[in-house]
Amino acid sequence: MGKIIGIDLGTTNSCVSILENGNVKVIENAEGARTTPSIVAYANDGEILVGQSAKRQAVTNPHNTLFAVKRLIGRRFEEDVVQKDIKLVPYKIVKANNGDAWVEASGKEMAPPQISAEVLKKMKKTAEDYLGEPVTEAVITVPAYFNDSQRQATKDAGRIAGLDVKRIINEPTAAALAYGMDKAKGDHTVIVYDLGGGTFDVSVIEIAEVDGEHQFEVLATNGDTFLGGEDFDMRLIDYLVDEFKKESGMDLKNDPLALQRLKEAAEKAKIELSSAQSTDVNLPYITADATGPKHLNVKISRAKLESLVEDLVNRTIEPCRIALKDAGIDASKIDDVILVGGQTRMPLVQKAVADFFGKEARKDVNPDEAVAMGAAIQGAVLAGDVKDVLLLDVSPLTLGIETMGGVMTPLIEKNTTIPTKKSQVFSTADDNQGAVTIHVLQGERKQASQNKSLGKFDLADIPPAPRGVPQIEVTFDIDANGILHVGAKDKATGKTQSIVIKANSGLSDEEIEKMVRDAEANAEEDRKFEELAAARNQGDALVHSTRKMVADAGDKVTAEEKTAIEAAVVALEAAVKGDDKAAIDAKVEELSKVSAPVAQKMYAEQSAEQPQGGAQQQAEPEAKHDDVVDAEFEEVKGDDKK
């Protein structure tokens, strides 16, 4: 059985890890970095760029560079948070036929799981390069507060990337695993405060020793799946835009190129202000008008940044309060606070957390890597390589069905330990009702329409009977991934109907299979592109070396040879500009053939000169013998040293 890798599929950055010889190893990517930007770009020549290479060209290709797509995964286009995002990103967010939020790049509409799959493929390749063997299985992390649609969409992304997703695990739980594995035995309760690039989670986790096993039990979780570092960046971008408008009268909001430069600069300034008291944002030639180019230069202090984002930091405290209340624990009873996610490096965030929980957070957990490390540990548990760990996670939101009067009737309350199964008997609302619609909901509101609709299905052929008589047993079954399976049974006839909740949107199996095939086709295209690039490089190198050889040879090359070589060089240069690898190979061969006689001539000449040069070199030492002075020295022994 191959290795099961752990992947932290982040909004801003992703990370891949593996358990090796009992130790967790974070794997460096091809660029030598331990995290990879979760950015995918579609270049004009059809190449798909992922990670740092995509980030580098974002300024010149803003409409086709997709970032923070995790915030759209499993979301409907009409949702408020999606509508808000449309105004903030330079790429297009469009409405799919099924009502989901999709993205558009290079004129092609794509589902968010397809984009996330490109990042996962990069993570998969990173692990394969390190291990030297194919990787097909993974544990992927999601925010604890992700709903069923978002979890399902993440699993779909894994499938499209060619991965068998063995488990979807909550990010704070993964971080607690990474933290708790090497801690001393005994019970302790920890808070994991996870403020990442696009999402916020907080979990109360009890780490206990039960029958020699490390038991990680999530007592409660809460969060906000649309609050993270990207929002902090936006506050800074808005401030810079306003300052520039005050100074120059020009609005940069409608200039995608300028906004992309501002995004990069804002992120850099935010990071710098975690360690410095002030920084300069200096962007020359940010735009131009009739009077000439305009430059942006704004000094920002840490205090200014903190005033811009203070309310965002405060928004994270209420979920902490709710999580403690749901867990039935007082803040003073928390043993350790673990900070996860790059945004937790901000001093204001650290202070807010310390003030609320009454203790400083631990500094020995890497906020960028802990989640991937925990996922790798869970992978090793599933593979049987780690035996003494038991993970008890929870369902983050209440699950129920719509009943008479548009009411949501809960079946599984939030923070119920998973996997779990719960059944409840319902009946008909009308006399002789022949079918019932089971409308599955997720959320905390009493009014059904105010909750997230996960899907509907019908149980038909109910025998005629007065209202309230038929016995319809509805069963909710949540698996270890937090994904819901729902069944309904007419107790009188034994007739059943069941579904794995796929939401009233989401991707169908056919769509996923098509995307998997597309991804495989892309892999073939990528291979061809690499081969073409190698052929072009070989062609360019041969043109350069041949021209140099002809120049060095001077009049030793005949006019006919020169003409033939130049014609072959021009033909190869033309072929290199094209996309036909076979044509490049043919022209390389042709140039090699016509330049071979000259190369042989040069080689023969060098060989003829070589012995002569060698003889001279050997003669020189002989000539110098008369001048050699023998060194005078005494051997110093033992205590004679001076």
From Swiss-Prot:
<dbReference type="InterPro" id="IPR018181">
    <property type="entry name" value="Heat_shock_70_CS"/>
</dbReference>
<dbReference type="Pfam" id="PF00012">
    <property type="entry name" value="HSP70"/>
</dbReference>
<keyword id="KW-0597">Phosphoprotein</keyword>
<comment type="function">
    <text>Acts as a chaperone.</text>
</comment>
<feature type="region of interest" description="Disordered">
    <location>
        <begin position="602"/>
        <end position="642"/>
    </location>
</feature>
<feature type="compositionally biased region" description="Low complexity">
    <location>
        <begin position="604"/>
        <end position="620"/>
    </location>
</feature>
<dbReference type="InterPro" id="IPR012725">
    <property type="entry name" value="Chaperone_DnaK"/>
</dbReference>
<keyword id="KW-0067">ATP-binding</keyword>
<protein>
    <recommendedName>
        <fullName>Chaperone protein DnaK</fullName>
    </recommendedName>
</protein>
<dbReference type="InterPro" id="IPR043129">
    <property type="entry name" value="ATPase_NBD"/>
</dbReference>
<comment type="similarity">
    <text>Belongs to the heat shock protein 70 family.</text>
</comment>
<dbReference type="GO" id="GO:0140662">
    <property type="term" value="F:ATP-dependent protein folding chaperone"/>
</dbReference>
<dbReference type="InterPro" id="IPR029047">
    <property type="entry name" value="HSP70_peptide-bd_sf"/>
</dbReference>
<dbReference type="GO" id="GO:0005524">
    <property type="term" value="F:ATP binding"/>
</dbReference>
<feature type="compositionally biased region" description="Basic and acidic residues">
    <location>
        <begin position="621"/>
        <end position="642"/>
    </location>
</feature>
<dbReference type="GO" id="GO:0051082">
    <property type="term" value="F:unfolded protein binding"/>
</dbReference>
<keyword id="KW-0346">Stress response</keyword>
<keyword id="KW-0547">Nucleotide-binding</keyword>
<dbReference type="InterPro" id="IPR013126">
    <property type="entry name" value="Hsp_70_fam"/>
</dbReference>
<keyword id="KW-0143">Chaperone</keyword>
<dbReference type="InterPro" id="IPR029048">
    <property type="entry name" value="HSP70_C_sf"/>
</dbReference>
<feature type="modified residue" description="Phosphothreonine; by autocatalysis">
    <location>
        <position position="199"/>
    </location>
</feature>
